[in-house]
């Protein structure tokens, strides 16, 4: 806000509920009085044309009636008014009024009055042009270097420039690549038209090029210019300013140079005649209008810029010289001379506030009213203060919105069918030996109040597929209940990383102050059964990957834990069970009779995750039903980092292959386009010439492009499958670390946030660099051992790494720090060095040795610790025996 406001010299309000824009204001000696005094010409969208000759307003008075010289209703909306030499045979000034479908040129004349009411003014129509296209704006000037007269150029809404040589129509040209009209100005020194296109670039067109270009009475003829006579319309120069322009002004510096001023949405540009930037000013506000004018200082330019904050800024080049406050938002600003008072600033608002003002030091003072003094009752103030503090404390505990109120607005519940669909809803699945089942999920929504824009979105982990994942609801009255049902099935022949789905409901709750509603989100999770992606199978005697989970309770019959996978013919096999995933992998689960342990084994490491997680969940549910509260699971084996690193390397290799294929495809595409251009040149040549096997080269390149595109698509499919397996292995690794170190729920959440940051894996932002940055941050903060490690600078950019050695080293170091008693936390004191407490019976690992070890030996570190000693070998059992000794 400026300290000084514009000093009001004369002001008035035009009409009632009329609208105005930047082209509706013009200052000139329109009646050719010869005294050098300007008149204010204002046109409105309601069709009114007014001409004012303002006089100084006495203190306490308002504008006089004689200030309004003329007011006439033209019936059609007035888009723009200009004054120039528009009539042939005379150099007198005339008024041009642009309507949407008509251009009218008037002469304004005054008759001296014989009475005290003043002079009488009238306008006379000299000529008019009916336009075939809807006009947008216009400009005028001595086009082509003519002397003593001005020509008019009108820009239509569809991009046609129509040139009128006073009483006659000259020609029309369409601007190339036109989309939306922009501001238009004429530069007399270069004899060119300057505009800003929809491509957000300033474009200059020579008048001579426009005049000699092919005539364009129809827009379709622009495509036929190559076949007809005449020249193509080409641009003289362009400059990309990166934003839309509000207005353009041409200001002559001297006889040999002029400047092009462009007012953008956020910047103010001054350009040379050839399109080079003379200077640019970044604006910290939203401008509404501007006007360059001659500066008192030699070689500088002053510019008035109005904005939507009721301010008018005066710049000398790029330096702010003055800021003044206006009573309205100006949409047009001019500088004129009235009755020997030069430099009067005339502003017009969009609702018709017309003001003539000048700059001065008239401060806008505000005097606060006196406050009635009264005696204070400190006892009552103490009681009120305690009540307010209690309210603030309650709000802090509940959050910005009370949780109970959020839950009461909309209740969302999900129920999964206990049985598979009798008729599978699976469609477009990959061919396989097994029939793909589906299961129905029902989502129920119940609202308490009226809600708007209610949208339900469901998400499941790929390759699980939904028959429908988007639903909309109309809760126009309170206490409505709506339900939707959909089916879930496995679309691809590999295993998902999770069986948990998420239903998210977004809605808006209208209030008295906000009828559009306050946006809110409610979500509900549901768990799909294991039998959706798994079938009963034969137990396997041997497997490449094995895990053993310890418990503190007696072993439970697997037939009781997994009744939906029990085989009636094998009732005696209560301690062994086989699973066959729909992707083809087999998993075997064994229970020991005496050692309170369970073993899970499979040929693929990532396939162990779902069965292991399902086993722990069903064991917890089993003992909860029995009322046992102290049940717990643990893991005392080796952390399988080597198997995990193999999956990381496979996923990273697919990412590198995808990047190489994309680069190769880009090269082949460039080659393909180059061959096309060569062929096109040969075909256009009037003299036939041999193709020199360009057609064969084009066909071969096309086949290479198609083959590379197919290879990229195949690699993306393999990458999706690899990422799903990597997420499964990551879930399993987090589970084993949690059981191994007995991590709390908060610590497990930190691990999940570090290892599983992405739902989707892309070339721009991949899993490896994201996880590496997260683990490096944990090692630097809560798991750091010294201040030296805290001083390490982490990379601010996430780029695809050259290899996975750094990531694997960080994961190994993370497990080692946890083994030494490191604590995961993200509080403010997390950066403090943690005291590494080594558990009893554990041999510490020297940090220097850890850093120097090779990658091949890094995963064997944990086998040297006593708390990670290899479990005693379990005797192999047959699938029929199923008993662990």
UniProtKB/Swiss-Prot annotation:
It holds the Pfam family PTHB1_pf. The keyword Transferase does not apply. Residues 684-764 are annotated as: Interaction with LZTL1. One of its GO terms (biological process) is cilium assembly. Residues 1-406 are annotated as: Seven-bladed beta-propeller. It is found in: Cell projection, Cilium membrane; Cytoplasm; Cytoplasm, Cytoskeleton, Microtubule organizing center, Centrosome, Centriolar satellite. The record marks 141 as: Critical for protein stability. The keyword Membrane applies. Keywords: Cell membrane, Cell projection, Cilium, Cilium biogenesis/degradation, Cytoplasm, Cytoskeleton, Membrane, Protein transport, Transport. GO terms for cellular component: BBSome; centriolar satellite; ciliary basal body; ciliary membrane; ciliary transition zone; cilium; cytosol; membrane. The BBSome complex is thought to function as a coat complex required for sorting of specific membrane proteins to the primary cilia. The BBSome complex is required for ciliogenesis but is dispensable for centriolar satellite function. This ciliogenic function is mediated in part by the Rab8 GDP/GTP exchange factor, which localizes to the basal body and contacts the BBSome. Rab8(GTP) enters the primary cilium and promotes extension of the ciliary membrane. Part of BBSome complex, that contains BBS1, BBS2, BBS4, BBS5, BBS7, BBS8/TTC8, BBS9 and BBIP10. Interacts with LZTL1; the interaction mediates the association of LZTL1 with the BBsome complex and regulates BBSome ciliary trafficking. This is Protein PTHB1. It comes from Mus musculus (Mouse). The lineage of its organism: Eukaryota, Metazoa, Chordata, Craniata, Vertebrata.
């Amino acid at each position: 806000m400026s300290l000084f406001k514009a000093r009001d010299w004369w002001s008035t309000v035009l009409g009632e509920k009329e609208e105005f824009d930047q082209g509706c204001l013009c200052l000139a000696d329109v009646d050719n009085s010869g005294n050098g005094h300007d008149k204010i010409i204002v046109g409105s969208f309601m069709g009114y044309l007014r001409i004012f000759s303002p006089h100084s307003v006495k203190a306490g008075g308002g504008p006089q009636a004689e200030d309004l010289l003329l007011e006439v209703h033209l019936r059609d909306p007035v888009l723009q008014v200009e004054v120039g030499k528009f009539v042939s045979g005379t150099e007198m000034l005339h008024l041009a009024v642009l309507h949407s479908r008509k251009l009218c040129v008037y002469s304004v004349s005054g008759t001296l009055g014989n009475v005290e009411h003043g002079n009488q003014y009238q306008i006379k129509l000299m000529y008019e042009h009916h336009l075939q296209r809807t006009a947008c704006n216009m400009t005028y000037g001595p086009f082509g270097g003519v002397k003593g007269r001005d020509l008019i150029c009108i820009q239509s809404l569809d991009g046609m420039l129509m040139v009128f040589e006073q009483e006659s129509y000259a020609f029309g040209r369409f601007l190339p690549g036109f989309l939306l009209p922009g501001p238009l100005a004429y530069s007399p020194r270069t004899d060119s038209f300057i505009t800003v296109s929809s491509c957000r670039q300033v474009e200059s067109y020579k008048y001579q090029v426009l005049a000699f270009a092919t005539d364009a009475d129809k827009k379709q003829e622009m495509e036929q210019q190559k076949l007809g006579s005449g020249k193509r319309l080409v641009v003289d120069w362009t400059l990309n300013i990166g934003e839309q322009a509000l207005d353009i002004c041409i200001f002559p510096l001297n006889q040999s140079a002029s400047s092009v001023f462009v007012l953008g949405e956020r910047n103010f540009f001054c350009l040379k005649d050839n399109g080079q930037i003379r200077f640019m000013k970044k604006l910290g506000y939203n401008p509404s209008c501007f006007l360059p004018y001659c500066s008192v200082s030699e070689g500088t330019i002053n510019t008035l810029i109005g904005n939507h904050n009721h301010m008018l800024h005066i710049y000398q080049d790029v330096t702010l010289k003055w800021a003044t406050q206006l009573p309205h938002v100006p949409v047009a600003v001019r500088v004129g001379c009235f009755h020997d008072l030069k430099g009067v600033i005339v502003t017009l608002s969009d609702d018709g506030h017309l003001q003539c003002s000048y700059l001065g030091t008239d401060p806008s003072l505000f005097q606060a009213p006196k406050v009635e003094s009264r005696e204070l009752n400190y006892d009552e103030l103490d009681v009120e203060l305690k009540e307010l503090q209690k309210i603030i404390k309650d709000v802090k505990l509940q959050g910005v919105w009370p949780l109970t109120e959020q839950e009461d607005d909309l209740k969302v519940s999900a129920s999964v069918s206990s049985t598979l669909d009798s008729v599978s809803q699976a469609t477009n699945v990959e061919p396989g030996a097994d029939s793909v089942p589906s299961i129905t999920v029902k989502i129920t929504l119940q609202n308490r109040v009226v809600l708007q824009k209610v949208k339900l979105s469901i998400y499941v982990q790929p390759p699980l597929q939904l028959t429908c994942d988007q639903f909309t609801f109309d809760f126009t009255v309170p206490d409505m209940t709506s339900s939707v049902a959909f089916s879930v099935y496995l679309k691809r022949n590999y295993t998902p990383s999770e069986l948990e789905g998420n239903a998210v409901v977004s809605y808006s709750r209208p209030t008295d102050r906000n009828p559009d509603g306050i946006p809110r989100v409610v979500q509900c999770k549901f768990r799909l059964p294991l039998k959706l992606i798994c079938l009963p199978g034969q137990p396997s005697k041997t497997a490449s990957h094995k895990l053993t989970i310890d418990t503190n309770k007696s072993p439970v019959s697997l037939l009781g834990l997994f009744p939906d996978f029990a085989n009636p013919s094998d009732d005696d096999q209560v301690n062994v069970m086989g699973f066959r995933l729909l992707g083809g992998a087999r998993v075997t689960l064994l229970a020991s009779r005496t050692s309170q342990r369970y073993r899970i084994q499979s040929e693929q490491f990532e396939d162990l995750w779902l069965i292991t997680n399902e086993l722990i969940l069903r064991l917890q549910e089993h003992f909860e039903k029995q009322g046992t509260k102290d049940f717990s699971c643990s893991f005392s084996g080796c952390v399988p980092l080597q198997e995990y690193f193999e999956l990381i390397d496979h996923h990273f290799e697919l990412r590198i292959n995808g990047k190489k294929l994309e680069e190769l495809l880009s090269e082949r595409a460039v080659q393909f386009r180059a061959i096309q251009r060569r062929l096109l040149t040969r075909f256009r040549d009037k003299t036939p010439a041999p193709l020199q096997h360009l057609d064969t080269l084009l066909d071969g390149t096309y086949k290479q492009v198609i083959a590379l595109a197919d290879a990229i698509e195949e690699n993306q499919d393999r990458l999706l499958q690899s990422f799903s397996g990597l997420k499964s292995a990551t879930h399993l690794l987090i589970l084993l670390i949690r059981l191994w170190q007995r991590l709390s729920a908060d610590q497990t959440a930190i691990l999940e946030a570090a290892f599983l940051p992405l739902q989707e894996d892309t070339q721009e932002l991949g899993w490896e660099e994201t996880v590496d940055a997260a683990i490096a941050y944990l090692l630097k903060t809560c798991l750091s051992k010294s201040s030296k490690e805290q001083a390490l600078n982490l990379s601010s950019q996430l780029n695809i790494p050259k290899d996975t050695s750094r990531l694997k080293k960080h994961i190994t170091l993370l497990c080692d720090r946890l083994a030494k008693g490191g604590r995961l936390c993200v509080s403010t004191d997390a950066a403090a060095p943690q005291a590494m407490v080594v558990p009893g019976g554990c041999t510490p690992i020297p940090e220097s040795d850890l850093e120097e070890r090779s990658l091949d030996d890094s995963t064997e570190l944990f086998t040297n610790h006593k708390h990670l000693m290899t479990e005693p070998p379990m005797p192999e059992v047959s699938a029929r025996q199923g008993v662990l000794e």
